[in-house]
UniProtKB/Swiss-Prot annotation:
Belongs to the bacterial histone-like protein family. This is DNA-binding protein HU-like. The lineage of its organism: Bacteria, Pseudomonadati, Pseudomonadota, Alphaproteobacteria, Rickettsiales. GO terms for molecular function: DNA binding; structural constituent of chromatin. It comes from Rickettsia prowazekii (strain Madrid E). InterPro entries: Hist_DNA-bd, IHF-like_DNA-bd_dom_sf. The keyword DNA-binding applies.
Length: 80
């Protein structure tokens, strides 16, 4: 499973000229921006990774609605 700490470690391995704290702050900023964008009902498109958006869903037993994150991956994500 990929966690935030795992992601920070991998980015730090690739960009070893940055301190781990700088990488952590960068990852936190990116995730915060993505989170805020979804809260504002904005669509997020990351080329060659996928699209994220908010969809309204209805509870089956009631007329109440809730928001859920919808992810659509590109067709070529798992092609070699």
């Amino acid at each position: 499973m990929v966690t935030k700490n795992y992601l920070i470690d991998k980015v730090h391995d690739k960009l070893d000229y940055l301190s781990k704290q700088d990488v952590k702050e960068s990852v936190d900023l990116i995730l915060d921006y993505l989170n805020e964008s979804l809260k504002e009902q904005k669509r997020i498109e990351i080329r060659n990774f996928g699209n994220f958006s908010i969809r309204k869903r209805k509870f089956p037993e009631s007329n109440k609605f809730y928001n859920t994150v919808y992810y659509r991956m590109p067709k070529n994500l798992f092609k070699d």
